[in-house]
Each structure stands twice: as structure tokens, then as C-alpha cells.
Amino acid sequence: MPEARRTTIDAGEVERFSALAQEWWNPNGKFRPLHKFNPVRLAYIRDNVAAHFGRDPRAAKPFEGLRILDIGCGGGLLCEPMARLGASVVGADASATNIEVARLHALESGVSIDYRAETAEALADQGEKFDIILNMEVVEHVADIDLFIEKCAEMLKPGGLMFVATINRTLKALGLAIIGAEYVLRWLPRGTHQYGKLVRPDELERALASAGLITKDRTGVVYNPLTDRWNRSRDMDVNYMVLAEKPTAEAMI
């Protein structure tokens, strides 16, 4: 019997998020935490991309000429601001329902984005290449994190950047991100996150290194209930972001 082909897709996760697809653009709906989280993600991406590629972050379109992949893009909450910053954006998601919602919203907003109902491995097999890959709140939902990071890294141009945001596997994260957010406060539907699939920073950085990427920066992200805002922090016990670079041939000599 031939060996089953490895896949990054967890069918249960795809089904779970497909069922919530109509909620993506409701800032007070089931994805409210993601809407609140978006400003700190955007600032981290904008500042690091501008510094790396020598762009002015205050310019109207600082990402002009850059090709970005938002893998696991959901309804397009990151794709649209990336496009407005001037990037050529491909938004990919395993859920065709999510992609339909994202396409409709982009059309209504007058934003040009190339949305595809594709997996990371399918895009990599097509030979796609990008300057920047956004891998935000996705790795804790895939079936095979090593394969997922490997396929994403294949699509990154030398000198390109990959941003990863996820949740640490700690008791603190269990209490706040799962029990607190899903069962007590009900900010997220129950079952959105599974503790065993959360990813520690050392595990993520090991997967990035195995795929040939160099970790350049890491930061925690914490929620302040008094201001109802997320902020960067040294505390990586719950939410955190990592920035990695694919070295150029010259850098590897």
C-alpha cells in the first residue's frame, strides 16, 4: 500500500472556521478578539518590513513592489491593509467559504487582492515566490507544523521575511486563551483552540531553522483589559510573534 501523502490540513479545523465565515468582518462578533489584535500585528509587520526593505513606514504605500502571501488568511483581515499599504497580495485559505467571504468584502471595499482556496503545499508545488509571508494565528490549527513551515519557507524569496503569530503552550495560556477566552468570557467559540496543538517558541524556532530560516526577532503580545487594547511585551507566556528571514546566498557563504 502506498504511503499516505503528508498534509498540513486538519479537516476539523477547516470545518470549524468555515462555519464562522460570515462573522469575519463583524468587529463585535465572534472574531472581535482578532479585530482588537489587528493593530498590534499591523504595526509589527509595517515597522519590520520598512526597516528590512529600507522603506519609509510613514509613506502612503511603503509596501509598493513587494509581493505578500497571507497564508490561512480567513476573511482577509490582514490582506486588505497589506494591499492598502501598496503590496501585491495573495490571500490563501483551505476554506473555500472563507475565501468567498474575503473576495466579497474586498470587492465591496474596492481593494484588489488575489484570493485562492489553496493549501501551503499546493501553492509551493506551483512554484509561487513571495517577499513576505504572513503566517498569523495559523500554526496552532495545522495538522503538521514542520511540513507547513517547510512549504511556506519554500515560497519565500532569499532575503524575504516570514511573520508568525501564535499561542504558547503553557498553563497560563490554557487559563487565559482557552478557559478564560472561550469558556468564561466567551470571546471565542468553544473549541477554537486545543491545548495540545499550541506551539512553544522553541518548537516554532526549531521548525523555522529546519526550514532554513533565521529567527530575527520575537515579542510577546498582552491584552490590557483597562484599555481594551493589545500591546507588545516581553511576556511570551500566552500570545507571541516571531520574525524570521530566509538568508541570501551571499549571507550563507
Curated annotation (Swiss-Prot):
<feature type="binding site">
    <location>
        <position position="136"/>
    </location>
    <ligand>
        <name>S-adenosyl-L-methionine</name>
    </ligand>
</feature>
<keyword id="KW-0808">Transferase</keyword>
<feature type="binding site">
    <location>
        <position position="93"/>
    </location>
    <ligand>
        <name>S-adenosyl-L-methionine</name>
    </ligand>
</feature>
<feature type="binding site">
    <location>
        <position position="41"/>
    </location>
    <ligand>
        <name>S-adenosyl-L-methionine</name>
    </ligand>
</feature>
<dbReference type="Pfam" id="PF13489">
    <property type="entry name" value="Methyltransf_23"/>
</dbReference>
<dbReference type="GO" id="GO:0010420">
    <property type="term" value="F:polyprenyldihydroxybenzoate methyltransferase activity"/>
</dbReference>
<keyword id="KW-0949">S-adenosyl-L-methionine</keyword>
<comment type="function">
    <text>O-methyltransferase that catalyzes the 2 O-methylation steps in the ubiquinone biosynthetic pathway.</text>
</comment>
<dbReference type="GO" id="GO:0061542">
    <property type="term" value="F:3-demethylubiquinol 3-O-methyltransferase activity"/>
</dbReference>
<comment type="pathway">
    <text>Cofactor biosynthesis; ubiquinone biosynthesis.</text>
</comment>
<dbReference type="GO" id="GO:0102208">
    <property type="term" value="F:2-polyprenyl-6-hydroxyphenol methylase activity"/>
</dbReference>
<dbReference type="InterPro" id="IPR010233">
    <property type="entry name" value="UbiG_MeTrfase"/>
</dbReference>
<dbReference type="GO" id="GO:0032259">
    <property type="term" value="P:methylation"/>
</dbReference>
<keyword id="KW-0489">Methyltransferase</keyword>
<comment type="similarity">
    <text>Belongs to the methyltransferase superfamily. UbiG/COQ3 family.</text>
</comment>
<protein>
    <recommendedName>
        <fullName>Ubiquinone biosynthesis O-methyltransferase</fullName>
        <ecNumber>2.1.1.222</ecNumber>
        <ecNumber>2.1.1.64</ecNumber>
    </recommendedName>
</protein>
<keyword id="KW-0831">Ubiquinone biosynthesis</keyword>
<dbReference type="InterPro" id="IPR029063">
    <property type="entry name" value="SAM-dependent_MTases_sf"/>
</dbReference>
<feature type="binding site">
    <location>
        <position position="72"/>
    </location>
    <ligand>
        <name>S-adenosyl-L-methionine</name>
    </ligand>
</feature>
